[in-house]
Amino acid sequence: VRIGQAIGIEKYKKFLNDLDLINSIQFDIEEMGKPIPFNWGKCKLATTSYGHGITTTILQLTSAYSTIANGGFRINPTLIKKEKYVKGERILEENVSSNLVSILRKIVTTKEGTATLANVEGYEVAGKTGTAEKILEGGYSRKKINTFASVFPASNPKYSLVVMLDEPKTNSEYVYNYRDGSGIKYKGTPFNTAGWTSVEVVGQIIEKIG
């Protein structure tokens, strides 16, 4: 929140717009989903600074992570394969892009990270989890939407992969040593946060198509 306050509304709003997270984007086909408009203020600045209070689409989130990971150049998503892609305008300095990818990599590789189930050997996956309570009229539901946005390989990012699961369910005896055998077997109330659901799906996708 303090970082958001230090940046200020106008600069932060411009940054989110530059990443195409809160504005409609140009695409080959019309998107069904679009970000919900909102009014900026001190409270909105505070909540958006830690990931709450805004909506976006999976396509826009994927595009934003691609921009963050590719050295900071804006991505224009397309379904058409081209012989040569023209770089968009620079949104981030290269050193900022590199530092952000390093942080995202630690979320996958460190014990304290929330995305260790995506640590597929040889692919250097980096990314960030998101667990959101579904909105109800006048409040929030206990049901969740889980997201994991990833880029890989971290040393030279080439791919972005985002998985969103709507109201996921988790096996209560899920084996946490899924990757390297060093974890524990959990018994009890199932975890249904992104680290146990969307992250696992991303890891399995990368393993199968890699």
Predicted feature residues:
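Beta-lactam-recognizing serine transpeptidase/beta-lactamase-like catalytic domain environment
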Residues: 1-180, 194
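Short, gly/Ser/Thr-rich active-site loops of penicillin-recognizing serine hydrolases
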Residues: 85-88, 180-210
